[in-house]
Amino acid sequence: MRTITRFLRRFLILLIVFVMGVAGTAFLMNNETTDDRSDMNNPTLPEVMVDFNGTLANRMYGYRQPMEADFVRDSVTPLDTTKKLTIAVNPYEEKIKSLSYEVRTSDGTKIVENRKVKSLDSSGSDGYLRAQIEISSGLLMNQEYSLQISLDTSDGEAYYYTRVVSRSSTNTEDYVKFASSFAQMCMDKNAADGLAAYLESAESSSTNFTAVTIQSPLSTISWGNLSPQISKKGIPVIKEINETTASISLKYEIKAANENGGAEYYNVTDFYRLRYTDTRIMLLDFQRSADQVFDPQQTVITDDGLLLGVRDKNVTMLSNEDGSVTAFTQEGALWTYAPDTGKFVDVFDFRRKSNGDFRDSRIEHDIKLLGINDSGDLDFMVYGYMNRGTYEGYCGVGIYHYDHDQNVVEERVFIPTSESFEFLKSDLGTLSYVNKDNQLFLLLAGKLYQINIDESTYDVLADNIDGNQFAVSATNAHAAWRISDGDQAGQVKFIDFDTLETRNDTPDAGQSLRVLGFMNEDVIYGIVLDGDSLTDENGHTTDGITSIRIEGFDGTVKKEYHQDGYYITDVTVGSTLMQFNLSEKTGSSYTVKNKDNIMNNQAAAAKVVSAEQSSTTRQGVIVKLAFDNKPETDEPLILTAKMKNTGEKTVQLDVDKSQISNIYYVYAKGGLDSTWTDPAQAILHADSLTGVVLNRAQQYVWERGNMKTQLTLNTEDVPEIIRSGSWDKDVLQQGLGDSGTVIDLTGCSLENVLYEISAQRAVIAKTGADSSVVIVGYDQYNTWLLDPATGEVSPYGMNDSTALFQAAGNVFISYLDNQK
């Protein structure tokens, strides 16, 4: 009996152990399968650079999908007469099977050449792989082409982009070395003394490391009292280069010790505009911005608020109603801060906490805060290049939700695009709004998209929208646009993105409407009577507005402005003020007689937190967040949010930009500055920034500082229709046909348009009410003018030419050869 009892006892014990083991295993397995929170994946893509005789330049980051060639212009790589390039690849942990390249026309429509390189040289001491490519196809001089480099890696294809251009005597290697050397010399006060000859320094009473220029004191350019060292060495990126000048951008990281010995990190961007001479390189322009990486482990909580450090004063931030949680962005990262508890959360950040490199720390993205609730839950949008994570190597728009209680970020939807960050940023600058039903609204390429986040679907609410006749409210919750086609053409449509309600305003007979903007959530539009849109003799149209209305979404007219005897022209709408001219009709144009404005009388909402600047001895000008009340604690609690794995939720939009043709891009100071529909205004703007202008096909329209000292065209090479001297643009375009595109340069100076002659393009210039000449040459003292009536070419003094063309209104017309 005792034996049976002992057996039963042992059996029960083993059974209990077995059941508990099974239950424990099931529990662990269940935890493993249901805990879908994790850290963001590390970057995997290799980097690609161009090796100029041992000097590296033009670092390229990989894309996981082919991009539209005409919407990626991160760097320009000059080709010499051999048309050979050495490509350097930093593989990191990836295995590279082969390299291939493809050369396309700058608009991306035609493949010029493509080849594959099977073997890469790994003998270099730096651990990089190298391949030499030789472009055998004939490339036009001074014309950009797109170069796509493809790597076949262990994780699939990766794509890299630069622009190549054949230029003579560009001195590329010297320019690149100068930029690297300049940045390094700034780290040593003694070495920095040798830079004084390159600068135009002036006295200054303050030090601001976010806005350093060639006029800044040498002490500021050499980092004042900060005493930093370079912690991540940059690789120069060529932004523009020609026979006379080059523009170089250099991004690097510096490290400095604070008052307590703690480490501070700063992202630095230097911009150099250089000219090569027989004796030395001249520094034509220099700009630097340094921005501190936020680190709450350092002393950042003070009685005066939260110290953000060295950065731009325009802080993207959002607080909930009682101010218990504030979200803010800094250097590509999103943080929340609770002043009552001292709690910081690193909500979203590509930058790794340790063992990072430029792949995770580069900032080719931006963050827009969409909403925050009383609990601290946060909705936000990340758009641009994704450094790491699920969508590493993609450019696009991601919508995210941060759950404060669970400390987890959930990706709601991702919208990939095939254009680089600077183009995407320009597109999203018009509209991006998410309503409470999780619907995202974007305006891209003339289409108004509604993306249904929960279903990963989208609808097109309207298309063929003229961006010049589209406006959004201060919150982006309302929009208005003039309908351009169909039965409702000419009507103005209003939409409330929260309710999706719409309504239309129809102009009365003999009137047309112009969308001017918004004041708060109220639309502003102008009424133009028939016959008051005047086209002058130079082909420029100006709307003479009779009345301006400010109207609520329900149709209530909040204000109407009208001045008897005057027309309203040149309207600009700001956040607090609308300004305009009061003009009189004079023949086929308007003459400004007075100015007026309308103030925004709505009181600004009280802010629970504001950004303020102060000055320090060591860091110079710094920025802090000031709160209504002193923070309760100066002891920080720092958390890092986890990413929730929800699977891939992507929406692919049918964005087609091929129909957009009359767009001109101004590049300056190392990036895309702005877009224009008027080439003359684009040139004037680029001139003020010492930049360049490219058209939709990425052809050079105008370059500052790249003009031959003298040149005369062979008149037989000038198209016959241009030699006619007509300033009727329609007639000129018809005469050029598919071979070229007319560009109206009216308003530019003679000095501006002589660039076109240097680029082998004649310019029609108006000289009187019914007369014109064709500029076909110039030298230091004269222009060379072709008489359309006789075909004779004769010199005319430069000063006399300037006066002649100015008296006629500076009416200039030229053309661009279409790519073949």
Language model features: what each stretch is:
Residues 1-19:
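N-terminal Sec-pathway targeting helices
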Residues 350-355, 415-421, 457, 463-469, ...:
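Short coil/turn segments at the loop-to-beta-strand junctions that recur within blades
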Residues 29-49:
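Ser/Thr/Pro/Gly-rich low-complexity linker/stalk segments immediately outside membranes or between
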Residues 710-820:
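Conserved active-site-adjacent core of cysteine acyl-enzyme catalytic domains
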Residues 339-342, 403-405, 452-456, 496-500, ...:
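Short loop/turn segments that connect beta-strands within beta-propeller blades
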Residues 43-102, 107-112, 144-226, 300-343, ...:
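Core segments of small alpha/beta cavity-forming domains
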Residues 19-33, 70-86, 97-119, 124-126, ...:
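Surface-exposed, charged secondary-structure patches
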Residues 145, 240-255, 376-382, 523-528, ...:
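A short hydrophobic beta-strand element
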